[in-house]
Amino acid sequence: MRDLQVISRTYPSGFKAKVIIRPDFYKKFMGIIVDFGGSDPQKLSGGAHFLEHKLYAKKSGDISYKFENLNASTNAFTSYNETMFYAEFINHWRQVLPLLFELVGTTYFTEENVTKESQIIAQELAMYQDDPSWQVNHDLLQKMYPNTKLAEDLTGTQSALNEMNPDILKDIYQKNYYSENLEFVACGGFTVGQAKNILIEVGKLQEYYFSQNNKKIIKNPPTLASATKDTTIKGDVSIPLVGVGIRFPSLLLMAKKLGLNPTELQILLQMMLQIRLGSSSSWFEAAQRREVINSPLSIDVTYTRQGSFATIIGASNKPKKLIEEIKLQITFGQILQSSFNLQKKDYIARNIRELDQIDDLAIEEAELALDNEKREDILNKVQTISFSEFCQIYEKILGESDIFTTILESEV
């Protein structure tokens, strides 16, 4: 595994920055990540995502055009616990850097531009809601984490979009966009000298644009799952869609008990579910022959501050049979050491490939930094964990988990 050359700095304000030097690449990346996302406390659902969109609006117009004039592209995303803004480019880092800070560090909210954005996001939400996989995933989350932001789409709800206004956006911004809640990352073909100069400029820019507040601890009171574990819903599908959700215990608390970090647990859980239910599992091949399943399952394990869960989604003309078999596999599925070793090799190979994907590498490094986690520590754990420890960890977590199911059938 190749070591990354990284130069880091923490400023007196608490703002953190790092430059990852990849000397053999022309491409460059700069981003600012915010330790705040869609499932964190906010007055209206979708507030974090709405704010992400509106930060591109400035008094002079859409700031994206300024990036384009430098032959740079800019984008952003909102996830459950973070928001990130970034730019990709080849040249002109000295011009791109202050633009990025202007993007994240200044606001321009008006009744007119907020109303217009509400209409745009409403169309985005409607598009998601028409997707059968979204419908199944949404129904599972409604049962696993009812009456929480996790149970609502990151884009919000129609009622929340109707209520959004400049004052609410200003409140979200002021509470979450401050020095100690932000981190900067650059990655790509920079020299050591350029990296040091970037960190000098970042120090000036963060001091100019962001206020200094003490880091706020986000409190997430425990939530109860729904008493209803199995539902059937109707939708526009030709083949029934099946969803199985696993609500895990707190991965943060479990990680402390097991001497791991939450990301390591997330990876190990993903590996186990792939071994038991993935396209290379013995079960999948047999299920295909028996026409229980049409195509590979979508398997995702998610860790958030508000709760952690897995969703397993697939299509089948025998939906009840598929659910029955998935539940059996989750609990009693065959685990071969050879499959475990293959999953480890696959994870290591993906890590190595990611080192050559400048944007993916930078985003993951920024995300890990927010949780005070390191890539090399996680990789070392995956490499060194024994087969027996792997199985014991899974059984321990599964023993404290609940399983929920959804079947999406045709309306006809």
Give the positions of each predicted feature.
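Charge-rich, well-structured scaffold segments of protease-associated domains
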Residues: I63-N214, L258-L260, S280, E285-V412
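His/Glu-rich zincin catalytic helix
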Residues: M1-I63, K170-A286, I385, I393, ...
